[in-house]
Amino acid sequence: PYPYSVGGERIWDEETPCMDPWVVIPAMAAVTTRIRFFSNVLKLAIREPILVAKTVGSAAVLSGDRVALGVGLSWMPEEFRSLHQDMRTRGARVDEAIAVLR
């Protein structure tokens, strides 16, 4: 069960539109000058760090460096299984990814 709803159901289903923030942030930045943008939590444990660095770096350039990146480990075993990754190594992978991003 999903722990963040009263009945244990997921709040969003697979049909709920969800835009990629790294596409939307440069679009919003193009029409603003003072707003800063934050990704909330990017599940870094299931992402490729070089691609994250390139994507976030591009958004930072296009926004005039008005971007902040929040990262997390991800707690859902299904995500790791679907990507054929070992959930038990997520902490070490995130540590390494943060080193790459810096």
Where are these regions (language model features)?
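N-terminal glycine-rich cofactor-binding segment that shapes the pocket for flavin-like pterin cofactors
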Residues: 1-102
